């Protein structure tokens, strides 16, 4: 039997699937199928299902139903939307952004402009590029935009693009499935976009993204879809991107060191952050 909430998550009619093998409508990943085949319990497995060709991303628990010591006659399965799990995790972990636009102190015309642009960005839906020297408060503005936006209840995931070695960059950003490469964690790893699902992904020092990966990230941002390394399922990712840089990206584009398409995807809204030395009335 298929309970109402599970049917809603999977997009299936409970009456239509009664008496039929569930695999006729639902395709599951290999490790989940292996657990079912061998009658093993599953605890908090992140699952990528295909339900009549539609991807469903959820957390699944399976409890075998046995009579005596025999092979299980079935399973009790509980499913939860992965976005719900992420929201609970970030609430418990204290990962909600706490900065507000009122934390942008100062009375200068420049800081008032930044505050107005940040308010407009918070109301909008486009990706945001924050430009300015190191130390001008780009991280504060990014958090404040997130917290003033309709995504405030979602996670705020901050990533320093300079922190990852080149050979690990894609696996860190796109995530990977179990066994995707030598040394990969057995349980796999979600992409940064999945971690930010329903919220904001803040890409600090975006100029440090290796050029050969620009087209991949640009495509994820454009389509709102990601496929983990070694994976076969496309995962929808509803994420807003805020990027920051202390570099003239237009100059990098002209030099061939930054892809124009990625810059276009990142900069629906551009906010220039002035250094304190240019706004003496705020000192």
Residue ranges of predicted features:
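N-terminal capping loop/helix in small sensory signaling domains highlighted by a polar->aromatic N-x2-3-F motif
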Residues: 1-7, 11
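Glycine-biased flexible loop/turn sites that connect beta-strands or occur in inter-domain linkers
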Residues: 53, 69-70, 217
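Conserved Sensor-2/SRH helix of P-loop NTPases
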Residues: 283
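Sensor-regulatory modules in signal-transduction proteins
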Residues: 49, 65-67, 276
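AAA+ ATPase active-site-proximal loops
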Residues: 96-236, 240-252, 275-276
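Sensory coupling linkers of modular signal transduction proteins
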Residues: 64-106
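Terminal output helix/cap of sensory domains in signal transduction proteins
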Residues: 10, 14-59
């Amino acid at each position: 039997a298929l309970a109402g909430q599970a049917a809603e998550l999977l997009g299936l009619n409970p009456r239509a699937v009664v008496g039929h093998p569930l695999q006729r409508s639902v395709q599951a990943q290999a490790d989940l199928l292996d657990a079912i085949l061998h009658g093993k319990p599953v605890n908090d497995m992140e699952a990528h299902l295909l339900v009549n060709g539609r991807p469903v991303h959820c957390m699944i628990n399976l409890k075998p139903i046995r009579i005596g010591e025999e092979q299980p006659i079935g399973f009790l399965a509980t499913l939860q939307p992965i976005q719900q799990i992420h929201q609970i995790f970030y609430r418990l972990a204290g990962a909600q952004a706490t900065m507000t636009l009122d934390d942008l102190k100062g009375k200068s015309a420049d800081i008032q402009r930044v505050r107005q642009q940040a308010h407009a960005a918070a109301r909008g839906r486009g990706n945001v590029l924050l430009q300015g020297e190191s130390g001008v408060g780009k991280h504060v503005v990014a958090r404040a935009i997130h917290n003033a936006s309709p995504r405030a209840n979602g996670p705020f995931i901050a990533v320093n693009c300079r922190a990852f070695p080149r050979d690990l960059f894609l696996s860190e950003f796109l995530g990977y499935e179990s066994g995707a490469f030598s040394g990969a964690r057995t349980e796999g790893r979600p992409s940064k976009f999945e971690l930010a699902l329903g919220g904001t992904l803040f890409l600090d020092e975006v100029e440090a993204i290796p050029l050969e990966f620009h087209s991949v990230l640009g495509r994820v941002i454009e389509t709102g879809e990601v496929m983990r390394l070694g994976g076969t399922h496309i995962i929808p990712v509803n994420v807003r991107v805020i990027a920051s840089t202390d570099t003239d990206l237009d100059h990098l584009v002209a030099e061939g060191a930054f892809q124009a398409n990625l810059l276009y995807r990142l900069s629906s809204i551009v906010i220039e952050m002035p250094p304190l030395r240019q706004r003496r009335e705020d000192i």
